[in-house]
Every structure is written in C-alpha cells, then in structure tokens.
UniProtKB/Swiss-Prot annotation:
Residues 1-67, 126-142, 208-229, 514-527 are extracellular. It comes from Bos taurus. This is Muscarinic acetylcholine receptor M3. The muscarinic acetylcholine receptor mediates various cellular responses, including inhibition of adenylate cyclase, breakdown of phosphoinositides and modulation of potassium channels through the action of G proteins. Primary transducing effect is Pi turnover. Homodimer; the dimers can form tetramers. Interacts with NALCN. Interacts with TMEM147. The chain crosses the membrane at residues 68-91, 105-125, 143-164, 185-207, 230-252, 493-513, 528-547. Residues 92-104, 165-184, 253-492, 548-590 are cytoplasmic.
Length: 590
C-alpha cells in the first residue's frame, strides 16, 4: 500500500515526546535519518530514545496514558469497522445469488485485500505508533511489510481490472461480454495477486541476502531497498500515479460513452412516439411506411441518411415449419414505397443479461405481411403489390395450407441524388432463425414463377402493426434497463475510485515532496498519511452499500440476522410449489 519506507513512526504528538529527548531537535529530518548525541541513539524514524544496547527508556513512546487510550480506541474502531464491513461483503456474496456476477467477483477480491489490511496491517501499525519502536523482531517486520505491500498493491491491481472491465463492457458490449465469464474473471483476479506478490514479497524478504547485510536498525521496521528517496519516488510513480492516471482516463471514457448511449436512447424513444402516428393503416387498403428504426449502434451514427427500418415484435414459431430451401430474388425499386404496399416484420432478439450469462445469442424470426392492394407482377421497376399474401404454388397442399419460410433481404443505399435501391425477395413470407448457425442454401427463382395467394384481412394487418409498436417499446425498455445497470456499475466504480484517490493522494504527495525537500514534512503528517491509506479499506464496503441496492439490502439482512427467515421463506415457497405440482399431476393423468 505505502510506497515509502515504514520507518516514519514518530510519536503522534511530537511536542510531548520532545521532553524525553535532550539536545538539538531532529524535526525536519528525512525519514530514516539517524543522529547521534553522545552515548544515545536518537532515531528520527522511530522517535524513541535508546541506549547503545537497544533498551528503550520510554515504554509509551513519549505519549501520555490518555493519548495512548485515544489512539488505541480510534484506530481500534477503524480496524473493527474495516473487518466487519469486508466480512459482510464476502458473506453477502456467498448467501445472495444475485450478487454472484462477474463484476462482483472483482469486488470480492478487493474485499479480501481490504480484510487482510484490517486484520493485520492496521493493528501492527497502531502498535508501532504507540510504542515508537518495533518490538516483534526482524522476521515479523519483514512478514508484516510483505503482507501489507502485497495486499495494498493487489487493491490497486483490482481497481485497474475493474476499470478495464467496465470500459470494455460499455464500449464493446457484443465482443467483450461474450468472453466475460466467471472463469476469465478468476484468471484476472489471480494474475492481480500473483503480480503483486512477485513485485514485493521476494524483494522485501530477501533483499538483505542479495546485498549481504541488513541495514535496518534494531527497533525499526521499514523496507530496506526503499531507504533512498529517489527509489521511493520511482515506486510512487509506477505503483500509484500511473494506475490513477489510467483509471481516471478510463472512467472519463466510460462517462462519455454512457452519456452518448443516453442520448441515443432518448432519440430511440422519440422515434417510437412518432411511429405511433406514422403507422396508421387506412381502411382503403393503403398504409404509410414503417418509420425508421435501427437497433444497432453503428446505424445510429448515420443521421444524415434516410433509414427505412423494420417494425419489430415478438413471434412464436410453434405453428411454423421451416423448409430446407430459401428462395431469393433481387429486384430494384424506385426511390419510394408504393402507396398500396406496407411491410411489417417481426423480430425476436433474445440476448442474455450481461451479469448472468457470458455469451449472447440472437434469434430472429421475421414475417412480412402485405396489406390489401392491387395485385401486380413483380418486376424490376416496382415493388410487389398484391391484395393477398403470396406463397409458392408448390407449397400448397391439397388437404391444407402450410406456410413455408423464405428469405427477405432488404438492402438500401443512398446516392448523391438522394435516391436509394432495395432488393426484395419474390416471396413476402419470411421466417429466418439465427439461433443455430447453420446456413441454408439459397436457390434463385425466376420472375415469372407461378404463385398462389392467401387472403389477408385488414384486421390482421392492423394487429401486426400493433404488435410491432408494442415490441418497439419493449426493446426500448430493455435498452433502458441495460443502460441503468451500466450507470449503477459506473457509479460504484466512480465511488471506489474517488475514495482511493482521496485516501492515497496525501501520502504520495508527501513522498514526492520529500524527494526534493527532506525537511518540509512534519513527522506527524507521515503517520496520518500512512494511516489514511489504510482507511481506504474501511471506506470501500460503504461505497458498495451506497451504490448497490442489492448489497445494501443483503447487509441489512445480515446485520439484523434475517438469514434464517429468508431461508424459511424460500423453503416454504418451494414446498407450496411442490404441492401445486403434485395436485396438477393427477388432473393431467385423467
């Protein structure tokens, strides 16, 4: 966590401890500076008065008993809140299945790092502050520093992973979310911890063996290779300022992309309102064309182009039997729709939620309904216009009629004159599915092929358009809900990032200042800045609760000991469902 050496544990109230030290004041000396007065060794870092054999003259480190009680109480409460808060996060993730999402796996890893800091780092550093010396030996010192730095660096790495995950989820929703699985999240979390361990643990534990001696004085505890301010400055840049810069840039990009999607959604809702007025079917048999509607984000950028989209609504395929062949026939048309023709297509987009399923599949079922109009022969200059739906004569049976699928492809392009071309298939009835990736062979048919017609009432056409408008609102609602989820995740990230910057920046600013001015930072500020970094582990669970309603409700349930009630309600519900099922089985058997 801390990027400077840990030997800045002078008394929290230096004016009190100065009464124990006789001679010139050591105020303003850089961390780790040692001054000698006669037979005494006064360490500016440890702030204790000791004889050459290492015995300490002041057991309270220069503090009064009330100061010790105040420091112990304040830091003890912070450590307890940190431990309880992060344990709540871990237990909530365990008991509530709604929290077992990919994004929350990263928060779980962050909570584990914060829990380690609350259990080990906070308490040992408090002891170090109160006693003004390290009394647990060299091995315990190195182990504490290793755990402290690995857990703190893992927190930074987890924040980086969360930032990149949010960024790719918003900017690359189709490609990234298909690969966004819990297994991949576990790999990323493991890499964050492994990298943190490799960077700090070996150097802290074995540096004294690399250089051949231990230069940390007895009674002090700090990282040996960070005793030089220049090295400390380099580690501060690499381990704090660079990650913070990257996370800030990513969050800014996330914010801009979210705002962009909000504007696009507002435009989509506005186009849906206009479509209700545009899609009025006249009793004479003619109708206006479907208003422009585009689901894909890329098409939204082409605001200068006129778009003739499709109206979408849900459709079931129980009564439809797809054929093995799909007949295509491309024909061009004039720059406008025929007044007697209108098309309504059905589309079912089944996409998995980004937090529940790692991949997305899309099933598209389409059917074109022709409104009553003049029956004409399809040619290269006019759109197909008919009073009835057209079905190949070969597909008509003697006993009953069975609708078969055909493929409809509409392609439109704009030239400089504002005209466009469309390609239509000969058959207006269409059923295509993209769930299975199998590709049916396309067989071209001639223009003069004989067709039969099925009557289509005005009521059916009106019903189709009504479903299309309803589904438009459903798709808009689904997009709005997805955007709300993205905003909530971005809010959680912003809260965590803001807390991280606020709590870590003061100490790292002092590190930079100390590199150029080793007498500008008072001793007390070092201790406060060091402890402020620890407080970040206390604040993180609060950020989860404030920004995530599910976390907040689960925390409340755990604190009020309502887990058993929740389990009992679930068991009672399952029992009721089982009773209902058993009651229905005999009825079905009869």
């Amino acid at each position: 966590m801390t990027l400077h050496n840990n030997n800045t544990t002078s008394p929290l109230f230096p004016n009190i401890s100065s009464s124990w030290i006789h001679g010139p004041s050591d105020t303003g000396l850089p961390p780790g500076t040692v001054t000698h007065f006669g037979s005494y060794n006064i360490s500016r870092a440890a702030g204790n008065l000791s004889s050459p054999n290492g015995t300490t003259s002041d057991p309270l480190g220069g503090h009064t008993i009330w100061q010790v009680v105040f420091i112990a109480f304040l830091t003890g409460v912070l450590a307890l809140v940190t431990i309880i808060g992060n344990i709540l996060v871990i237990v909530a993730f365990k008991v509530n299945k709604q929290l077992k999402t990919v994004n929350n796996y990263f928060l779980l890893s962050l909570a584990c790092a914060d829990l380690i800091i609350g259990v080990i780092s906070m308490n040992l550093f408090t002891t170090y502050i109160i006693m003004n010396r390290w009394a647990l030996g060299n091995l315990a010192c190195d182990l504490w520093l290793s755990i402290d730095y690995v857990a703190s660096n893992a927190s930074v790495m987890n924040l980086l992973v969360i930032s990149f995950d949010r960024y790719f989820s918003i900017t690359r929703p189709l490609t990234y979310r298909a690969k966004r699985t819990t297994k991949r999240a576990g790999v990323m979390i493991g890499l964050a911890w492994v990298i943190s361990f490799i960077l700090w643990a070996p150097a802290i534990l074995f540096w004294q063996y690399f250089v051949g001696k231990r230069t940390v004085p007895p009674g002090e505890c700090f990282i040996q290779f960070l005793s030089e301010p220049t090295i400390t400055f380099g580690t501060a840049i690499a381990a704090f300022y660079m990650p913070v810069t990257i996370m800030t840039i990513l969050y800014w990009r996330i914010y801009k992309e979210t705002e962009k999607r909000t504007k696009e959604l507002a435009g989509l809702q506005a186009s849906g309102t206009e479509a209700e007025a545009e899609n009025f079917v006249h009793p004479t048999g003619s109708s206006r064309s479907c208003s422009s509607y585009e689901l894909q984000q890329q098409s939204m950028k082409r605001s200068a182009r006129r778009k003739y989209g499709r109206c979408h609504f849900w459709f079931t395929t129980k009564s439809w039997k797809p054929s093995a062949e799909q007949m295509d026939q491309d024909h061009s048309s004039s720059d406008s729709w025929n007044n007697n023709d209108a098309a309504a297509s059905l589309e079912n987009s089944a996409s998995s939620d980004e937090e529940d399923i790692g991949s997305e599949t899309r099933a598209i079922y389409s059917i074109v309904l022709k409104l009553p109009g003049h029956s004409t022969i399809l040619n290269s200059t006019k759109l197909p216009s008919s009073d009835n739906l057209q079905v190949p004569e070969e597909e008509l049976g003697s006993v009953g009629l069975e609708r078969k699928p055909s493929k409809l492809q509409t392609q439109q392009s704009m030239d400089d004159g504002g005209s466009f071309q469309k390609s239509f298939s000969k058959l207006p009835i269409q059923l295509e599915s993209a769930v299975d990736t199998a590709k049916a062979s396309d067989v071209n048919s001639s223009v003069g092929k004989t067709t039969a017609t099925l009557p289509l009432s005005f009521k059916e056409a009106t019903l189709a358009k009504r479903f299309a408008l309803k589904t438009r609102s459903q798709i808009t609602k689904r997009k709005r809900m997805s955007l709300i989820k993205e905003k909530k995740a971005a809010q959680t990230l912003s809260a965590i990032l803001l807390a991280f910057i606020i709590t870590w920046t003061p100490y790292n600013i002092m590190v930079l200042v100390n590199t150029f001015c080793d007498s500008c930072i008072p001793k007390t500020y070092w201790n406060l800045g060091y402890w402020l970094c620890y407080i970040n582990s206390t604040v993180n669970p609060v950020c989860y609760a404030l920004c995530n309603k599910t976390f907040r409700n689960t925390f409340k349930m755990l604190l009020l000991c309502q887990c058993d009630k929740r389990k009992r309600r679930k068991q009672q519900y399952q029992q009721r469902q089982s009773v209902i099922f058993h009651k229905r089985v005999p009825e079905q058997a009869l």
